[in-house]
Swiss-Prot record:
CC annotations in GO: cytoplasm
Boundaries of every Helicase ATP-binding domain copy: 97-298
PANTHER family membership: REVERSE GYRASE
Protein name, UniProt field: Reverse gyrase 1
Cofactor note: Binds 1 zinc ion per subunit.
CDD domains: DDXDc_reverse_gyrase, SF2_C_reverse_gyrase, TOP1Ac, TOPRIM_TopoIA_RevGyr
Length: 1242
């Protein structure tokens, strides 16, 4: 349980877990129920104790079903104890069991050693004791034989003998088995996939209550076998066709999946279906849609590997390269000895693998080369009869994907960098084709190319690794039946003939051009192949050693760049065999550690006690706000399995010592209730807050939304919107129910909402809502959505910060009280006066009823005051100017403003005299990285993106893991951030010593400036997305890239030397042809004609995509123009003032400097003023102008309530709120002050 000094009192309506009534925060914090359900106010450490007390008091209501599940769980736990030497289910098994007992179907994707098959067998045994029938499906008869033996042993230990049937080979036995199945004379039927497909018509008519598919990857290897599984579950051919049609239809997601859900619920009914696998290479969308869950994929990014290298380009200098390479491999194998996988480049192929293996055997090394058909050699390696294997480094190769032996594989050796290599003009590998097509699209921006790319990607995603290998072979041999594929090859090869295009592609796309050949690092193959040395086995992630023999230095740089992008950071160790050194570490020590681990695993495997290694594995529910963030996080560790609960999608993945279940709350779940004054229960109720005995108790209800988009925060008696009468489509009560369900099945809950007061309050509300269902709940804090940051947050959870919670409570109540009180005044009293006045002026007789679109707020009112005052001063100082433009804009591109004179009008000829031309240099920057206010200001001023849009874009970029948290007033850069800049600069091949100036820009602390999380400029980001290196859960728009580019440039420039800006200053006069002197707005023009880096300027061109500049570059005027006259013309007039109107950016800067608002509210304040039509933005110059309504509102509020909404009072109050956040001020004292203040509003 979390430690909070004193729980802030509040009431949550309809949130009692037992009766659905109102309940206090203290009771939820205690893991209890409401007073109506239990008079005693006591604390419960677990749900079982609470249920027992309620049962004793005969007051068990909504928790009855959970009581039944927990009682059955105890029985299953007893079975586990009897069968597994008094062992209880480990974390994942407990989660699976609870889901099973709730009647859920789901997928288990977990590594060997977590007891998946054992779980399936025990649940089928449990089912048998309840007269329910089970079918367990395996890929091979060998596994069936082992399972029958295991079940026999289980039956003996449990003293219960279920009727077990299993399929045999002969037709007679098959017929006999089918007869027994039809008669129902069985409890457990054990079958192969093949038997199910061959006898589907008979088996689909037999009612199985529990279907357990032990190797779903094998079961889904073809559409036919996937269809067989669906038919066995009970789905008809018509169901499958309907689902296929619905998935293709262009209708809303809710309608589409609602119809599929109806099919699912009608067929599954009382059936439970569980898919189990250690890995899965592909999915089936129809099966996933109908089952309501999707199996995940193999865990390829979880690794504990020493990545080492030997640079053959240096060590083999002056020697025969092939002989030197062979000698290095021999020396390595004699040093490492046993358990090694050796990978040769795909361009050298299987022939070279055979050649290498033969040479190694000649040197006394026990090695075999393997291909896809070498099953016997793999088995020999597994038994230890062969010490090492040689195969081709290709992503579908048998050694890359087809071997999973954690107790056997120790080392990997790459004889050259894994790569795609092809001659320009030939048919390359289809995966290389997709990468090149994406680069063609980036450089040429050709929609036809984009269409081909999309088509080929979809095709490749649908086929199995074996089918991909066959396709690659056919293409290599010139057999291409697919016309669109052929068109893509022809198009790419045509482009590759253009040398200029090749240069552009190599700059953008991480490839090496060697003569007529193109080389691209195959980083996925390196990750997967080296990953064979570091596998999950139970709770253990084995240690591995990978040795990469570098045969191309540039390709190694590109490989490293890709690996850092995918894995966050890869540390490389230089390997010196003779010195026995791995970097500064002893090679012998690492080797001994690896060998000891493998011996331990071999012993566990031999003794058949796999589960004993998994006792520390636990299940963790990780809750975030947004679905995008949930998807991004779950994809860090694998392609997760998913399950759907209504509209909420839940992701499941594996992290070594835990199974991680990721879900999203969708932002705030609760908010202050919004009953009208007429609905008040008593006078102590003040706008959603109960005021009693000097206590302030906020009342919260779940947030609801209707079809028309209205948000409602009140308890409804009907499923109807009280505003418009439309149907309620979203009620966060559903989210609470789902999170409670998930919390019950896990060992711990971590709440990873945003790291600010709003995020803390969301987390606190979730904590209270689920506390009765799980007592082990903590806060996970992270400031960037990266693998490194998420792992750190999971490993280092913290307690809840009650000061942040109290601060948000104060802010929300203050916003509500002031907002509602003053808003009512505006909507009624003010509007009646204002509307009547307008009607009289317009000679109209209008009925001036209340105007509910009007609102006032503590912060928005001073900001409106600034806008109105600035506008008034602007008008007071406004003058009319003539616009004068040179007739030759190529010489002088600037407009000149002159005070209007009588007799001068449009098209009048004017002379501009260039009196003097000078040059000066100034240092510019570096500026610190962005904070929220500076980002919003720059985005508004430079990109003309409104603040509200910039915040939405930044929120997306944060959730997609591309930038750090965007609501911040810190300029600090962490060491991780500095390393991002360093990595980027190295990737641009600049001299770090000349140009890199690492700066932290602030003191230590949790918060950081807004910066990129990856060393990718805008062009590189686009390339990474197009090539599939980055798979984002949301498509980026034009504005996403523009804002990202701004953030990236500002950050990188903050780590560079200052810029030296060259300016030209031109002093001018203007007069008519009659020598009448004109009074100019300014008699000089100052503009930037160039810039350079103060140090390391030779790299400026290389870094042009990364340098932040606020200025536009102009062509310099020739100094010979000094004293010359230019012909010009008056082109128009404009009004100009000495006082400038605000832009959005300037208004935000003003809020920051005057300490009005916070990073999270700057955009909201401006957006609200626009929404209420108090201000508008001019079309061209984007200046903020108050409307007549805005000016009237400001005048009314300042005349009547200045003491409440003045800038001075607002700043003072915001300071006190910050002090609540820091624990310096009691939040109840501040609420009392606010309460007294609103009483003055009569």
């Amino acid at each position: 349980m979390t430690s909070i000094n004193k729980v802030p009192p509040s009431i949550y309506t309809r949130s009692c877990p037992n009766c659905g009534g109102n309940i206090s925060s203290q009771r939820l914090f205690n893991g209890s129920v409401c007073e109506s359900c239990l008079k005693d106010d006591r604390e419960f450490s677990n749900l079982s104790d609470l249920i027992n007390i309620l049962s004793e008091n005969s007051n068990l209501k909504n928790l009855t079903q959970i009581r039944d599940v927990l009682e059955e769980y105890k029985k299953v736990e007893e079975i586990f104890g009897k069968l597994l030497n008094n062992s209880k289910p480990i974390g994942p098994q407990r989660s699976w069991t609870i889901r099973f007992l709730r009647g859920e179907s789901f997928a288990i994707i977990a590594p060997p050693g977590l007891g998946k098959t054992t779980f399936g067998l025990i649940m089928s045994l449990y089912n048998a004791t309840r007269n329910r029938k089970s079918i367990i499906i395996f890929p091979t008869r060998t596994l069936i034989s082992q399972t029958v033996d295991k079940l026999a042993k289980f039956s003996e230990l449990y003293s219960y003998s279920p009727r077990i049937l299993y399929n045999k080979q002969s037709p007679t036995q098959t017929e006999n088995i089918l007869d027994q199945l039809k008669s129902g004379n069985f409890d457990i039927f054990i079958s192969t996939n093949r038997f199910v497909i061959q006898n589907l018509s008979e088996l689909s008519n037999i009612k199985f209550d529990f279907i357990f598919v032990d190797d779903v990857d094998a079961a889904l290897k073809s559409g036919k076998s996937a269809k067989a599984i669906l038919r066995l579950v009970g789905f008809t051919d018509e169901d499958i066709q309907t689902t296929m049609k619905l998935l293709r239809e262009n209708i809303g997601e809710e309608e589409k999946f609602g119809k599929i859900q109806e099919i699912r619920e009608s067929r599954l009914k009382d059936k439970i279906v569980i898919f189990s696998s250690a890995t899965i290479s592909r999915g089936n969308p129809i099966l996933s849609s109908l089952m309501g869950f999707r199996p995940g994929s193999s865990v390829i990014y979880l690794r504990n590997i020493y990545d080492s290298y030997i640079d053959l380009t240096q060590t083999c200098k002056g020697q025969d390269f092939e002989e030197c390479t062979l000698g290095t491999v021999i020396k390595l194998l004699k040093r490492l000895n046993d358990g090694t996988l050796i990978f040769v480049p795909i361009d050298k192929g299987a022939q070279y693998a055979d050649y290498l293996a033969s040479n190694l055997r000649d040197h006394g090394i026990n090695v075999e080369s393997v291909a896809s058909s070498s099953i016997s050699k793999l088995e020999k390696f597994e038994r230890g009869e062969v010490s090492s294997l040689v195969g081709v480094a290709t992503h579908y190769g048998v050694l890359v994907r087809g071997i999973d032996l954690p107790w056997r594989v120790k080392y990997s050796i790459f004889v050259g960098i894994p790569k795609f290599k092809f001659k320009i003009g030939e048919y390359m590998h289809p995966l290389a084709l997709t990468r090149l097509l994406s680069l063609v699209y980036l450089v040429k921006n050709d929609d036809k190319v984009r269409g081909l790319l999309s088509y080929i990607r979809k095709r490749l995603r649908k086929i199995s690794p074996a089918a991909l290998a066959m396709l690659a072979k056919d293409i290599r041999e010139g057999k291409i039946d697919d016309e669109r594929l052929k068109e893509a090859y022809n198009l790419v090869n045509e482009y590759l003939k253009d040398n200029e295009f090749l240069k552009k592609v190599s700059d953008v796309g991480d490839l090496v051009i060697e003569g007529d050949y193109i080389l691209m690092p195959d980083y996925l193959t390196y990750i997967q192949a080296s990953g064979r040395t570091s596998r999950l086995y139970g709770a253990n992630l084995t240690t591995g050693l990978s040795v990469l023999l570098i045969d191309n230095s540039r390709l190694f740089e590109l490989l490293n760049k890709k690996l850092n992008l995918i894995l966050d950071e890869v540390k490389w160790y230089s390997l010196d065999i003779d010195a026995d050194k791995l970097g500064q570490v002893s090679l012998s020590d690492i080797s001994a550690k690896i060998t000891e681990e493998r011996e331990s695993l071999s012993k566990i495997k031999k003794e058949g006690n796999v589960e004993s290694s998994s006792l520390s594995v636990k299940t963790t529910l990780f809750i975030v706000e947004s679905p995008n963030k949930a998807k991004t996080i779950s994809n860090f560790f694998s392609r997760p399995s998913t399950r759907s609960y209504g509209k909420l999608r839940v992701y499941e993945t594996v992290l070594g010592d835990r199974v991680l279940i990721v879900a999203a709350s969708g932002g705030h779940i609760y908010d202050l209730i919004t009953e009208d004054e007429s609905e008040k229960q008593d006078d102590n109720y003040v706008y959603g807050v109960l005021v009693k005995d000097s206590k302030f108790i906020p009342i919260y209800s779940t947030i609801k939304k209707c079809e028309k988009g209205h948000q409602i925060v009140k308890d409804l008696s009907q499923n109807k919107c009280p505003i418009c009468g439309s149907r309620i489509v979203t009620d966060k009560t559903e989210v609470v129910d789902i999170l409670r369900k998930l919390a019950l099945e896990v060992d711990e809950v971590l709440i990873g909402t945003d790291p600010d007061t709003e995020g803390e309050k969301i987390a606190w509300d979730i904590y209270l809502a689920i506390r009765p269902f799980n007592g082990n709940i903590k806060r996970a804090e992270f400031h960037e959505v990266t693998r490194r940051a998420i792992l750190n947050a999971i490993k280092n959870p913290r307690e809840f910060n009650d000061n942040l919670v109290k601060s948000q409570i104060v802010r929300r109540i203050e916003d509500r009280w002031i907002g509602f009180k003053l808003s009512r005044k505006l909507q009624t009293e003010f509007w009646e006066q204002h509307c009547t006045s307008i009607s009289k002026k317009n000679s109209k007789d209008e009925e001036c009823k209340e105007n509910r679109n009007l609102s006032a707020g503590r912060v928005q009112t001073p900001v409106l005051d600034w806008v109105v005052n600035r506008y008034q001063k602007y008008n007071e100082n406004k003058k009319k100017y003539l616009i004068i433009e040179s007739q030759d804009k190529s010489i002088f591109p600037f407009s000149v403003l002159a005070l209007k004179k009588n007799g001068l009008s449009k098209n009048t000829q004017i002379i501009i005299h260039l009196e003097d031309i000078n040059i000066k240099e100034e240092e510019f920057g570096p500026l610190p990285p962005y904070t929220t206010d500076t980002l919003l200001s720059d985005a508004a001023n430079l990109l003309r993106i409104p603040a509200s849009d910039t915040m939405r874009v930044a929120q997306d970029l944060f959730e997609l893991g591309l930038i750090t948290y965007h609501r911040t007033d810190s300029t600090r850069v962490s060491n991780v951030g500095i390393s991002v800049a360093e990595t980027y600069l190295k990737s641009k091949q600049v001299d770090i010593s000349k140009i890199f100036r690492p700066r932290s820009w602030g003191e230590g602390g949790a918060h950081e400036a807004i910066r990129p999380t990856k060393p990718l400029d805008e062009t590189m980001l686009k390339a990474s997305i197009e090539q599939g290196d980055l798979e984002l859960s949301k498509q980026l728009t034009f504005n996403h890239f523009r804002v990202y580019n701004l953030i990236f440039r500002r950050f990188i420039t903050s780590q560079l030397p200052p810029l030296v800006v060259t300016k030209q200053i031109v002093r001018i006069r203007a007069y008519t042809k009659d020598n009448i002197e004109l009074e100019l707005d300014e008699n000089k023009k100052e503009f930037v004609i160039g810039y350079k880096l103060k140090e390391g300027d030779e790299f400026r061109q290389t870094l042009q995509d990364a340098i932040y500049t606020l200025f536009r570059l102009y062509q310099p005027l020739d100094e010979k123009m000094k004293g010359k006259e230019l012909s010009a013309t008056i082109t128009g007039t404009l009004n100009k003032s000495d006082v400038q109107l605000y832009t959005e950016g300037e208004l935000i800067s003003e809020m920051k400097s005057k300490q009005i608002g916070r990073p999270s509210t700057y955009a909201v304040i401006i957006s609200t003023l626009k929404k209420r039509r108090y201000i508008i933005e001019s079309k061209n110059l984007k200046k903020i102008i108050p409307t007549k309504l805005g000016m009237a509102v400001k005048e009314y509020l300042m005349e009547n309530y200045k003491q409440i909404v003045s800038e001075k009072r607002t700043v003072k109050l915001l300071e006190k709120m910050n002090e609540v956040e820091e624990g310096k001020v009691d939040y109840l004292v501040l609420l009392k002050e606010l309460y007294n203040e609103i009483q003055t509003i009569s």
